[in-house]
Amino acid sequence: MAMMPSDSSHHGIVENSPYRTTQGRNEETGELGASWYFSRKEIEENSPSRRDGIDLKKESYLRKSYCTFLQDLGMRLKVPQVTIATAIVFCHRFYLRQSHAKNDRRTIATVCMFLAGKVEETPRPLKDVILVSYEIIHKKDPAAGQRIKQKEVYDQQKELILLAERVVLATLGFDLNVHHPYKPLVEAIRKFKVAQNALAQVAWNFVNDGLRTSLCLQFKPHHIAAGAIFLAAKFLKVKLPSDGEKVWWQEFDVTPRQLEEVSNQMLELYEQNCAAQAQPSHGNEAEGSSASVPNQRVSVKSEETPLPHQSKQSSSQHSTGAPSHHGVEHSNLEKQTVDQKMLQNDNGDHGSNKTRSNQSGSRVDFGANDGLHHDKQSMTENKNLPSHGNSSEIRDVNRNGNDGTNVTSLMVNKIDKDKVKAQMEKQRKLKGDVARKVEVIDDDDDLERQLEHDIELAVEDNKIKQERKQSSPHVMHRGDHRNADQVTGNGHLGKQNTPETAQDAPMDDIKEQRNSHGSKHHDSHDTAHERGERDYKRPRPEG
């Protein structure tokens, strides 16, 4: 929660803040403004927050918290990434000399963003910074956006930010000079001429993720840039060039020990993220990777050997796309992708028929309804049957005489799913619902319900036909068509034009046979001629 003038934490900033005594002590030793670089041990053990009962784990959480807050604030204010990085460095330096227990991190972060905008010549109005910051701080309160627009609330918040700005400037000793690893990183990659775009992007992401740690308080910008390039090359499996006896990392004036430490601290961030997500810990593996970094660095020619914790770009970083997953997970994902492609190749056309894509990119999956897919061979055998009338009309052409065995598969074969979907879209447009965007799963459900409705109608029609056939004593199975002889106009039997199978017979003839329903064999030829159809006589079964 943001500090208000009446809060005790607010008074702690000015009255109880240790920055005055800290300033005096540092001025005596000549520390203030002279150097912002300390060892990791000094930062972790001598932190002012530690003296106020905040342990290392809690402080690490608070550090990541205000980094995330600044990233979100910077994106909403539409400032460059360099401005966001400067604000984060200001915060790190502030809490190097101030305690989290006495200074609200989000108020200090808001001030640092306001200062960073002016330092990097990308200023944002104080009013905009206050409004956006207040909305982020109270994002769970729907009324916060309207409350901050009230004059009394806004004036209180403005007074708080301006007061905190003076505290931040005094704590930093008015030293607002900040250098980032971005410039040396880009300049070095330009010289490599190897996968420049990909290498620069991944290394840039590692630098952005490194801002969430205390690396900027331990190492100079070009050292951090070297570590980011090293990890990016391992992640992309790119071999960095060397000029004779001089290897690439010597361009950064970095020692092997420094390169190792920078790389390992960057990797620790991803290990902590995995642990926070309740995933299996890889602590032992991480220790092994730490020990192996110097050897891999010295023999940098063998860079084809990846680190155990190569990182993958994270979807959680909106503007940076920073890596956040280990190489093990990345390799498993690749393996699953390959297996899926192999499975699709094995399935052939059958697999492609299960999923269809429309022009909008929506996927309609019919594979989930196993009841709609029976014997694929029966569908193939009947694919040459001519279609008449409605595309969803089902005709009994089952050779084995089991009337209902392949009815469902034939229904799916006959029903034109694209036409059904087109009809559904047409109905939506008629209702004035053109602008409405439908989710993929809703579209799938609507289409499946329409298909099921058509199938139910077809099944009912088929049942009616079956009942009529069973009520007739002269019903023929399809296999009996093989021995059926055509009745000519004068009553004589002939086999010249008799189809051998039901597939060879015109569909109108088959339909006429079904609609006869046991009609008398002495129907006149003239009556059949008036209907424009030929009449077949069904011989009585022998024996």
From Swiss-Prot:
InterPro entries: Cyclin-like_dom (IPR013763), Cyclin-like_sf (IPR036915), Cyclin/Ssn8 (IPR043198), Cyclin_N (IPR006671). Residues 460-470, 508-543 have a biased composition (Basic and acidic residues). Residues 276-299, 379-392, 399-408, 485-501 have a biased composition (Polar residues). GO terms for molecular function: cyclin-dependent protein serine/threonine kinase activator activity. Keywords: Cell cycle, Cell division, Cyclin. Residues 1-27, 276-330, 343-408, 460-543 are annotated as: Disordered. One of its GO terms (biological process) is positive regulation of DNA-templated transcription, elongation. SMART domains: CYCLIN. GO terms for cellular component: cyclin/CDK positive transcription elongation factor complex; nucleus. CDD domains: CYCLIN_AcCycT_rpt1, CYCLIN_AcCycT_rpt2. Residues 309-319 have a biased composition (Low complexity). Coiled coil: none annotated. Pfam families: Cyclin_N, CycT2-like_C. Belongs to the cyclin family. Cyclin T subfamily. PANTHER family: CYCLIN. This is Cyclin-T1-4.
